[in-house]
UniProtKB/Swiss-Prot annotation:
Record keyword rRNA-binding present: yes
InterPro entries hit by this protein: Ribosomal_uL14, Ribosomal_uL14_bac-type, Ribosomal_uL14_CS, Ribosomal_uL14_sf
PROSITE patterns: RIBOSOMAL_L14
Keywords: Ribonucleoprotein, Ribosomal protein, RNA-binding, rRNA-binding
Lineage: Bacteria, Pseudomonadati, Pseudomonadota, Alphaproteobacteria, Rhodospirillales
Name by which UniProt lists this protein: Large ribosomal subunit protein uL14
One GO location term (cellular component): cytosolic large ribosomal subunit
Keyword rRNA-binding attached: yes
Organism encoding this protein: Rhodospirillum centenum (strain ATCC 51521 / SW)
SMART domains on file: Ribosomal_L14
GO molecular function annotations of the record: large ribosomal subunit rRNA binding; structural constituent of ribosome
Gene transcribed to yield this protein: rplN
Signal peptide stretch: none
GO biological process: translation
Amino acid sequence: MIQMQTNLEVADNSGARRVQCIKVLGGAGRRFASVGDIIVVSVKEAIPRGRVKKGDVHRAVIVRTAKEIRREDGSCIRFDRNAAVLINKQGEPIGTRIFGPVTRELRAKKYMKIISLAPEVL
């Protein structure tokens, strides 16, 4: 469950290390976002010579949350930290690699590029 001011780690090699959610997209007054939702983020920490710089504003799709996700079969899945992948306006990832596992829920939201780059889909 991600809301405004939430800090997330970046799960790709775009150059950002840590981002902060500044807006949850999808409807007026929408407060929370979960796995597969798009948010607007500000880069708070970045590596030198990366594709993105500190202070840049980008869109991101959430790939892991600390709040558990209920599945249709009744099972739950949760992670230690919140993580996101930076995307451009067309919905394609800015980075070329994804670090760590991603959830199956991304397949239903049509993020096939992120799923194909991920080392593990849970």
